[in-house]
Amino acid sequence: MRVRATARVEAVAPERGERLIQFLRAYKSAVQEIVNELWCLKKTPSNATLHRAYYDRLRGRGFRAHHVSEIYKRAREVVRATKSNAGSRPLLKKLTARIHPLDYKIDLKAKALWLAVLNDGWIELKLKWYDYLDKYLNGSWRLGEVLVSYKHGRVFA
């Protein structure tokens, strides 16, 4: 049996999170750019077609390979959901990035999360730990993707 649990943890970024914010803005603008291009098409392309169309372009901007795949998958999801609900062209507002398991490292003892950002850089986030998290994050659970968000001057993972 599979169980999916979500734990939201506040984090503290070094240097006021400038590199993280730069990465999140670049991520959001890349997703928005692809959304704008896909919106004009009658049929949403497959992931393989999106990969061929956007992989080299996004890698050239400094994104890691797994970031690129998450970007075009996210754009495809947004376009499909909006079109199925007969909505207008979506405009992304939140600074949120979906991080693949190979693009982060977590040390539960030190309560730190390292994220891969642009141009193969890494930043360390110190996690604000709560006692209830020990029940879930004691090393017995396999961690999947991480969503990193920046909202009102606070970072959440």
Please annotate each region the language model reported.
Residues 1-157:
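Nucleic-acid substrate recognition interfaces
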